[in-house]
Swiss-Prot record:
PROSITE patterns: SUBTILASE, SUBTILASE_ASP. It is an enzyme of class 3 (hydrolase). The lineage of its organism: Bacteria, Pseudomonadati, Pseudomonadota, Betaproteobacteria, Burkholderiales. Heterodimer of a large and a small chain. It is found in: Secreted. Belongs to the peptidase S8 family. This is Protease 2 small chain. Keywords: Hydrolase, Protease, Secreted, Serine protease.
Length: 63
């Protein structure tokens, strides 16, 4: 997979020293079909609309 985003080189979270090395996954054939990914930050632990829909214990890191 070749990223077509003109700002890809600035997205350190994908490919930089501290990134997830997405290009390595893409080179190995992982492209994300059939996967749902969410990044959820602070502020959800006591949000009334989300309390009933949490599927993991607080503080759990999926990665």
């Amino acid at each position: 997979l070749t990223p077509n985003d003109p700002l890809y080189s600035q997205q350190w979270g994908l490919s930089g020293t501290y990134g997830i090395r997405a290009n390595t996954a893409w080179d190995n054939g992982y492209q994300g079909q059939g996967k749902i990914i969410a990044v959820v930050d602070t502020g959800i632990t006591d949000h009334p609309d989300l309390l009933a829909n949490r599927t993991s214990p607080l503080g759990y890191d999926f990665i």
